[in-house]
């Protein structure tokens, strides 16, 4: 396994991968074609995840968000095509492509993006563009690609943003937990082990080629308010909940339909929300 990363966040160190004997770490930027080519050498599979993520980070960096996603994906696809031996190229997209209201959405449903000029949607727009790039590299050049749209991943070792990650950190310190507006936004949370199972299936199943898959756990749907209460309860924390105004665009409802992934990948999320939070807290 070879990982190309800028190391701007200590994601690998937090997960213990920086010293794993089966992992080779290459420091580089996906926007630098030479770095991508060096990382691609000798590889059979590509899992392309490089991007800026997290609403707060995207709001502050809308231009780099789009540049890294689009330029980075173009570099990765061109390199993979020229490499000539890639068995599967998996492009990580996002559930954000479904916009502000997404109930039981299927892969073929029309995507819905926000108004031009609203910084939040730069991430979704760029990811939708990378999906089109990946699919058309398959259609036009025969590169065996597929795309995954993950719905709210969480788990141990997570860095950066994400509600469960933020809530867990504060709950363990008995610090107040901030909730945007009334906390009535609904999300479906998918534990990291289930996401990994889906990735492995997408790598190894021929049916995945040329397809896009929603990957998530509709059974773990909950409001942000009740999620915060659940984290506090499981952590046996003394944290209080604070409601803070949020004036930016937000997603009110996001729950996936994963029937396609069940049929073609054999995917079904196994870890329920309570168990996942317990493992994340451990």
Label every model-predicted segment.
Residues 19-23, 108-114, 141-142, 168-179, ...:
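A short C-terminal helix-loop "cap" of Rossmann-like NAD(P)-dependent dehydrogenase/epimerase domains
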Residues 81, 138, 172, 203-204, ...:
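Protein kinase-like catalytic domain
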Residues 273-282:
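Amphipathic terminal alpha-helices
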Residues 122, 160, 192, 220, ...:
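Amphipathic alpha-helical segment in the mid-to-C-terminal domain
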Residues 128, 146, 153-166, 175, ...:
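Glycine/proline-rich active-site loop of Rossmann-fold NAD(P)-dependent oxidoreductases
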Residues 35, 75-79, 189, 194-197, ...:
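Conserved mid-core alpha-helix of short-chain dehydrogenase/reductase
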Residues 192, 212, 223-226, 247-268:
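Conserved C-terminal active-site "lid" loop/helix of NAD(P)H-dependent oxidoreductases
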Residues 1-150:
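N-terminal Rossmann-like NAD(P)+-binding domain of SDR-like oxidoreductases, especially those catalyzing
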């Amino acid at each position: 396994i070879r990982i190309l990363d800028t190391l701007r966040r200590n994601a690998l160190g937090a997960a213990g991968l920086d010293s794993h004997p089966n992992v080779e770490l290459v420091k580089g930027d996906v926007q630098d074609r030479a770095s991508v080519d060096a990382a691609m050498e000798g590889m059979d599979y590509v899992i392309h995840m490089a991007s800026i993520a997290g609403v707060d980070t995207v709001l502050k960096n809308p231009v780099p968000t789009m540049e890294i996603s689009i330029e980075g994906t173009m570099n990765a696809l061109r390199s993979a095509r020229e490499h000539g031996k890639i068995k599967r190229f998996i492009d990580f997209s996002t559930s954000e492509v479904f916009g502000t209201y997404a109930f039981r959405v299927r892969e073929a449903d029309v995507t819905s993006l926000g108004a031009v000029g609203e910084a939040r949607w730069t991430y979704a727009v760029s990811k939708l563009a990378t999906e089109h790039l990946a699919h058309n590299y398959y259609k036009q050049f025969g590169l065996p690609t597929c795309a995954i749209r993950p719905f709210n991943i969480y788990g141990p070792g997570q860095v950066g943003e994400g509600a469960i990650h933020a809530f867990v950190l504060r709950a363990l310190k008995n610090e107040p937990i901030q909730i945007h507006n009334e906390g009535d936004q609904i999300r479906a949370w998918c534990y990291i082990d289930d996401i990994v199972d889906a990735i492995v299936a997408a790598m190894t199943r021929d049916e995945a080629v040329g397809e896009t898959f929603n990957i998530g756990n509709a059974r773990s749907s909950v409001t942000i308010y009740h999620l915060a209460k659940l984290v506090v309860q499981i952590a046996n924390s003394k944290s209080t909940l604070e409601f803070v105004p949020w004036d930016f665009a937000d997603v009110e409802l996001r729950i996936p339909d994963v029937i396609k992934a069940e049929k073609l990948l054999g995917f079904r999320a196994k870890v329920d929300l309570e168990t996942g939070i317990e493992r994340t807290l451990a």
